[in-house]
């Protein structure tokens, strides 16, 4: 067995997100309010997976971590999420050009999110939707 794994080439579209980001966000259930925080993105195990850590400066929003991966046989992406409340969720992920979408359909809470990476790579615009 070798000490390092090869990079998962299917996750290459996530590379522009690597690093630390400042966040400014809104929430569909809290119209007119703006929230700030941080997000960081990094490779896990030399690129076998991609990790997202997020935290908003408002106690109403949990600090969370997500791991992105792929299924090479099905040509699909997924995200596994966990936060400080003990909530864990699985999301389906789609990548097209500079746009990353993740979603889940569940009886109690369905969610959709879209991130669009700017052409210059200096910002990411996100939009979230949810239904209960």
Each model region followed by its residue ranges:
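Hydrophobic small-molecule pocket/channel-lining residues, especially in calycin-type beta-barrels
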Residues: 1-132
């Amino acid at each position: 067995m070798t000490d390092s794994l090869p990079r998962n080439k299917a996750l290459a579209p996530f590379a522009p997100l690597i690093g630390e980001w400042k966040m400014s966000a809104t929430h569909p259930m809290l119209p007119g309010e703006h929230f700030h925080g941080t997000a960081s993105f990094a490779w896990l195990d030399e690129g076998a997976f991609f990790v997202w850590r997020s935290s908003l400066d408002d106690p109403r929003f949990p600090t969370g971590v997500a791991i992105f991966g792929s299924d090479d046989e099905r040509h699909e992406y997924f995200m596994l999420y966990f936060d400080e409340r003990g909530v864990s969720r699985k999301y389906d992920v789609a990548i097209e050009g500079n746009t990353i979408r993740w979603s889940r359909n569940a009886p109690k809470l369905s969610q959709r999110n879209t991130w669009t990476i700017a052409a210059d790579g200096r910002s990411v615009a996100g939009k979230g939707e949810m239904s209960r």
